[in-house]
Amino acid sequence: MWVLQALAIMLSIQAGVLDLVEVPPVVRSLPVALPAPVNLPAVLPGSPGLNDPAKNRMLPPKRPGAPSRGGKCAPAARYFLSSDKLQAYLLSILPPQIEDMVKCDKVNMEGVLGDILATMQDSNLLSILDITSLLQGGGGLGLGGLLGKEGNEDPSKPSSGSKATGGLGQLLPEGLPGKEGLGGLLNLGGGKGSGKGLLNGDGLSNVVKPLDDIVENVDSLKAAVQDKVKSVVPENIKDPFSDLLNMDIQETMLKLKVKQVKVGSTDINMGADGIKVLSEVTADVEGEGLLGPVFTLLQFQSVMDVTMNIAVSSNNTQCVNLDVQDTHMHVKEMNIQLLQTVTETVPLPTSLPLNDIIPIVLTAKMNENLEKSDSCGIVLSDFNDCKNTTGLFGYQVHTARISPKGLSIDYCVKANIDNKTVPVPGGRLPPDPKNANVSITTASSALRTLVKYVAKQSSVQMNDLEAQITYIAFAPQENNMLRLLYKVDITKDSQPYATGETKLFISHASKILNSKLVPDVKLTRSEHSVVPPETKEEVEGIMAEVTRKAWSRFNELYKKMSIPDGVSSNTLTNSDVKLLRSNDLQAAS
């Protein structure tokens, strides 16, 4: 019957007939099941759009930018840094920076948490503490021991006098005076005298003295425990335990401060799209002003993940750096730890019923504060000092890329000879040495550019003879030797007269010390031949002068030879420069 009446009411509303200011008696009599009120704040600070499910998850990282590319030249040099060395650098530099970021004033983790707790001003301690786990924790030394509720005891039954003394009773060694009065002091059993022992003062004076003796004689029991225990039993409070459990949160949390941040583990994944970092972090936020019988400290411990993407950037210069992108803090849980000091400090993690809300608000607000801050972010400025260097060869970044093997930087190369800039042709570079941490490779075209320039500058005139190098080539030999071959056209009175051929054998023992090339080349021997042979005696002098001039010029320029800067935090400190079969130069460590 009432269903039909309700239907009639709905139709009347649609027709605009019924005035809803006065509720009809039929509706007033309908049974309604109301849920029990929940003592939670309606609006949490700094959490706009909290009900948006998309904001309750970790923010997806932005896609890293494409590898940095320079001009259209073909690379003629490469610097390589292995993934092991790169990860070692990140593992040494990231954890302290992550800790500083979480503790940063502008991220304001403690302030955000304080604002959340401040909204619970109508709540008491029981509304946020999972009191069941407290009553079961600590082996009778927590609130369960003090209230006579052991972990396996039915909380609906009256507590027994013997178990009621278990908590503080374990604090008093056998034989100390006053221990026998503890049962009277904490007579919280279900009998008629429940609670009277605490208020009539019997045994109270006998407990304070033993507590003083414990603090003095047992190193593991801190003085703060005694002070907190005393504060529970002031004479003017009739029910101190009730007052403790119903203490207003704002009275207990006078101040919040991030005391310690610790990075537990850091995983680094290197791929073609950059470096992905995941760090597990715990942050302890301490509160001052808590009154408790056996606990000296109330800690809020946040467990979070810090993620970031790291890409390479060069801005088309000779320097490459690491750019930290998409730093994100994801608070997974917020625990309360009650640190108990008896023989040692024992953390008792206590879950928050609000664990589904507090981490979400902290995550959103802390990331918002981090994004607004200009001083809390992670900057890897010491990865590369990016100094402008000069030398015989100039290097400009062509491509910088990250791969599972490590960081590779390819360079365009130009030779700066006699105030002239000569592009160095690029080509296919040899692979990086196996198991190398750091390596530098310079294409054979760099040495060829140098040799060709020397050949053009080695013309000689002597009496009526003139010699000019018309062909030059070089090839590697055993034991890091270099054979340089060149041909000379010799004219007499401007007419072709003879053709000479010279082979120079050069030892190569150059090194890279502290990222600088230390040249060491020596001319060990030379061989000459002339066509026609009958002109040999006449042209020997001019051919020797060509050799002297060419070698002098080559040696002078080679000593000015420079190498790519690479990364200043990972350089070659003492490495031999090897001449490969491909005529490329390579050094590694």
UniProtKB/Swiss-Prot annotation:
Tissue: Abundant in the lateral nasal glands. Also present in the posterior septal and vomeronasal glands.
Keywords: Glycoprotein, Secreted, Signal
Primary localisation category: secreted
Post-translational modification: N-glycosylated. The N-glycans consist mainly of complex sialylated and fucosylated biantennary structures.
Entry GO terms, CC: extracellular region
Range of residues in the leader sequence: 1-29
Residues that carry a glycan: 419, 437
Region (Disordered): 49-71, 146-170
Alphabetical GO biological process terms: sensory perception of smell
Subcellular location: Secreted
InterPro entries linked to this entry: Vomeromodulin (IPR034433)
Keyword Secreted belongs to the record: yes
Stored PANTHER family: BPI FOLD CONTAINING FAMILY B, MEMBER 9B-RELATED, BPI FOLD-CONTAINING FAMILY B, MEMBER 9B-RELATED
Protein name per Swiss-Prot or TrEMBL: Vomeromodulin
Organism whose genome encodes this protein: Rattus norvegicus
Gene: Bpifb9
